[in-house]
């Protein structure tokens, strides 16, 4: 959500950064059931306590956590998997994530992206199964100042799979845009 929020803030002239980075960002409308008449039902379902509790309870199974991780296209180490499981088993966290997804509407952002002037780096895990890598190509067509770096073998959680590599890319992009980055 961070990249979409930052892009929106740039477009609304709330901020004027010299560089933006999107990590497997959901900048375009998500596929699936997004019909406007169904969205109030989706929002109602995710706003209550029962769905987050049910989801968190299902994540009590290590096998279910592994299935969820597999759907991201990412392969976390044992510690990363443990931390992901801990978060997934917390109703407050799952509730917040479900609420965010239930309220996600990037149609206005998609219409405005051609006006984005900040240099945008789209970092894409080639194995991402949540936000398909091809979405970055669509964003690049809309945003003249965008470029894509695709990372083979990494999924939606690329920042957790290869944090040092992601950090290097962010720093390199910032420096390329004249941002002073401490060594």
Q: Which stretches of residues belong to each language-model region?
A:
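Glycine-rich nucleophile elbow surrounding the catalytic serine of serine-hydrolase chemistry
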Residues: 1-8
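Flexible "cap/lid" loop of the alpha/beta hydrolase fold
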Residues: 8-11, 15-49
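A conserved amphipathic alpha-helix that caps or lines the catalytic cleft of carbohydrate-
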Residues: 9-10, 140, 170
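Active-site acidic short loop of glycosyltransferases
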Residues: 15, 117-118, 144-145
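Conserved alpha/beta-hydrolase catalytic His-Asp/Glu region
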Residues: 31-36, 53-115
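Short beta-strand/loop motif that positions the catalytic acidic residue
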Residues: 116, 122-124, 128
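Conserved alpha/beta-hydrolase "acid-adjacent" motif
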Residues: 129-135
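Catalytic active-site module of serine/aspartate enzymes centered on a nucleophile-bearing elbow/loop
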Residues: 144-183
